Swiss-Prot record:
E.C. number: 2.5.1.39
The protein's required cofactors: Mg(2+)
GO biological process: ubiquinone biosynthetic process
GO MF, any single term: 4-hydroxybenzoate polyprenyltransferase activity
Pfam families per UniProt: UbiA
Gene of this entry: ubiA
Protein name: 4-hydroxybenzoate octaprenyltransferase
Pathway linked to the protein: Cofactor biosynthesis; ubiquinone biosynthesis
InterPro entries, A to Z: HB_polyprenyltransferase-like, Prenyltransferase, UbiA_prenyltransferase, UbiA_sf
Record-linked HAMAP family: UbiA
GO cellular component: plasma membrane
Organism: Vibrio campbellii (strain ATCC BAA-1116)
């Protein structure tokens, strides 16, 4: 394999832009820390960290395969490996299979419940890229796909799925819809021209309001989560930091400028990190 082809594969997997993997990783770590009520098992943690990066890469590959005919018409995506011809469709499918199989082999080291849950995760990861053609709610499907690691991680750590798992699942799904709507605001003008659907288009001039409501509900549910586990004051300070980050994001998107909407999206990485820190300190 030439260096140029290897670089194209690397870009196709978004390894040069790991923000998506990090946004998938942090909630997975939330689940592991809460399930363990402290530091999770090292082998489970390692499997899920590797699995997150492999599955996110697989998701990026199948997403670009699904969008290969439209990405060339979008300013932000026209230089991606598939629309630019650096990687063929056949090569992309082969890479997707390698990444997907590698992820599944990791899951096979976990307990039977985790293995069963993984099939739904694979299904969600596969269908999400195609949803933007059929519904204005593809961000909802991304929320489900990005949250599915939560029950999987919990099951791997404890072998059980208590109701609180699904509470955390909803927290992350709402947060994901909020930040991916910010992301969709970047491409809204291009998407309207080529017929791609998104919540940014659905919400229209109410986009900032809906994002704000989703962020407020996310924060409220995080507070309720802390009350359920009787977490200490340090946890609530981190929620306050997360709230301030959301306020900053609202400031960034106030004029719906592309670059600032993308900056707001990227800022969510810090939200995920802050909550991880809060949970680790609280359960330590």
């Amino acid at each position: 394999m030439s260096a140029e082809k290897a670089k194209a594969y690397w870009q196709l997997m978004r390894m040069d832009r790991p923000i998506g993997s990090l946004l998938l990783l942090w909630p997975t770590v939330w689940a592991l820390v809460i399930a363990a009520q402290g530091m999770p098992s090292w082998n489970v943690l390692i499997v899920f960290v590797l699995g997150v990066f492999l599955m996110r890469s697989a998701g990026c590959v199948i997403n670009d395969f699904a969008d290969r005919k439209v990405d060339g018409h979008v300013k932000r995506t026209k230089q991606r490996p598939l629309p630019s011809g650096k990687v063929t469709s056949k090569e992309a499918i082969g890479l997707f299979l390698v990444l997907g199989i590698s992820s599944f082999l990791l899951v096979l080291t976990m307990n039977p419940l985790t293995i069963k849950l993984s099939f739904a995760g694979i299904f969600l990861a596969f269908i999400y890229p195609f949803m933007k053609r059929y519904t204005y709610l593809p961000q909802l499907f991304l929320g489900l796909a990005f949250s599915w690691a939560i029950p999987m991680a919990w099951a791997a750590q404890t072998g059980e799925l208590p109701w609180i798992v699904w509470f955390v699942f909803v927290i992350n799904a709402l947060w994901t819809i909020a930040y991916d709507t910010q992301y969709a605001m970047v491409d809204r003008d291009d998407d309207l021209k080529i017929g791609i659907k998104s919540t940014a288009i659905l919400f229209g001039r109410h986009d900032k309001l809906v994002i704000g409501v989703l962020q407020l509900v996310t924060l409220a549910m995080l507070v309720l989560l802390g009350q359920h586990y009787e977490l200490g004051q340090s946890y609530y300070w981190t929620i306050l930091v997360a709230a301030s980050l959301f306020v900053y994001q609202q400031h960034l998107i106030r004029h719906r400028e592309r670059d600032l909407c993308f900056k707001a999206f990227l800022n969510n990485n810090y939200v995920g990190i802050v909550i991880v820190i809060g949970l680790l300190i609280a359960f330590w």
